[in-house]
Amino acid sequence: MNKKRSPKTVLAAGPSSKRGDLIELAVTALDEDGNGIGTHDGTNVHVIGALPDERVRARLTHVGKRHLHAEAVEVLTPSRARLAQPSCKRAGSCDGCPLIVMHYPDQLNWKRTFTERQIRRYQTLGAAEVLATLPSPNQLHYRNSAKLVVSGTFRRPVIGIYRRNSHQVMDIGTCPLHHPLINRVVTAVKEGIAKCKVQVYNPRTGSGLLRYLVVRISERTGTAMAVFVTVERNYNEIHHLAKHLQQSVPQVEVVVQNVNSSEGNVILGQRDYFLTRQHALTEELGGIRFTISPRSFFQVNSGGARIIYETVRQWSSLTGKESVVDLYCGIGGIALFLAGTAREVHGIEVVEAAVNDAESNARLNRIHNCSFEAGDAAELIEELVEEGERLDLVVLNPPRKGCDAGVLNKVAAAGPARIVYVSCAPATLARDLDILAGLGYATLRVQPVDMFPQTPHVENIALLVKKLPRNDRLESPAKERSRPRASHKAKGGAV
């Protein structure tokens, strides 16, 4: 992006703006995707590559009735938050980390501001304290896994991600967010594709073999797993590629061929073939060991995950006498972290494979007071209550869409003294906290955690306590929750 102003540029004006036009505007905020927000002729414009307190020249990429979208081509007046030299030479062209051009303290401030803006939309949450964002232990090289597209030809292979608004694959080379071992694996695989003449899959023609590369690493052991996703078995080509990879990077201890012949953008298929004797990695967080298989879910930022788990344990205030339910428990991370200070922990998860991993992790750590069950969260928590189980603490860790109202009603009906809610989406977190307020639970504080530096994503932990009982407290249906306050047209908040 050029920072010099060109006096010869003709700028668009008036309501007849069209795609490709150049406009000048002042940027006042960031949206939830990390794009700048400004106005042009009274219409909101979302500008890729722009920061608050900047004036930019931008090219319109989409013209809608209510919003315009643009890409900054020139920063006329830079923000104090803008870095003079970003950590990645692809900044501005890669969608992976739009905030890499911003000073890290400003990223943390924006994430708190964005979280607080979502929380304050609800009158019931006015007393909740939104704390300063906890930083990631590592701002770069924190990702312990990568899912990458393989493109090009065996003579000139490309491994990376799709360019913005395109099916063209951008070679990521050495990514500053990836653990250095991941970057070494990617480099070795590119060399191996050429050396072993591995045919690269072409989605237009349906020809070729290798579609994706998935890399996972264990920070504890310094070892790696490589998963080659192919359209068919073809053992010969992948066997030679695996041999080259392990010779080039001896830290690769697990190599898997996954066969995915389906169309579409789903990465992993249903069939795995292990090309090594070892089938999994082992990671450790806070003294708890986890088995990482090709399909296991594991947080991509190990240091950030440790902060979340430790905060949940601290806010739970367990004494060893409590019964805990961990809803949406995944592979059992939080449940196993809490087991040492609880009487018993029940993990509930809808994905059966994740429950199998959780049970395996409990055995690995010789933890005997954790049980895990696969099924519907609302139904299983109701069964626990009907069986006479007293629930002292409920931990919620749902996907981005948040919790169903039925789940929240069942949780409130169980009457735990405390609820700790872990969320990856501030908007749905605020919505669910408002529902729980109507069901008798007050949100005391919300803790943003930066799990994904250089990106707009933010995790949050909320602590809720049961209010003093009122006759009508738990009779309020979820649908009667307070309506959010009128929100600004532009999403997000200023840095």
From Swiss-Prot:
Q: Where is the composition biased (Basic and acidic residues)?
A: 472-483
Q: Which CDD domains match?
A: AdoMet_MTases
Q: Where is the composition biased (Basic residues)?
A: 484-495
Q: Name one GO molecular function term.
A: 4 iron, 4 sulfur cluster binding
Catalytic center residues:
C424 (nucleophile)
User: Which parts of the sequence bind S-adenosyl-L-methionine?
Assistant: Q299, Y328, E349, N397
Keywords annotated in UniProt: 4Fe-4S, Iron, Iron-sulfur, Metal-binding, Methyltransferase, S-adenosyl-L-methionine, Transferase
Give all residue intervals belonging to the TRAM domain: 16-74
As recorded in UniProt, its EC number(s) are 2.1.1.-
One GO-annotated biological process of the protein: rRNA base methylation
Q: Which Pfam families match?
A: TRAM, tRNA_U5-meth_tr
Q: Which Gene3D superfamilies match?
A: 2.40.50.1070, Nucleic acid-binding proteins, Vaccinia Virus protein VP39
Q: Which residues bind [4Fe-4S] cluster?
A: C88, C94, C97, C175
Broadest EC class?
transferase
Q: Where is this region: Disordered?
A: 472-495
The record's similarity note reads:
Belongs to the class I-like SAM-binding methyltransferase superfamily. RNA M5U methyltransferase family.
Q: What is this protein called?
A: Uncharacterized RNA methyltransferase GSU1452
Record organism: Geobacter sulfurreducens (strain ATCC 51573 / DSM 12127 / PCA)
Q: What is the lineage of its organism?
A: Bacteria, Pseudomonadati, Thermodesulfobacteriota, Desulfuromonadia, Geobacterales
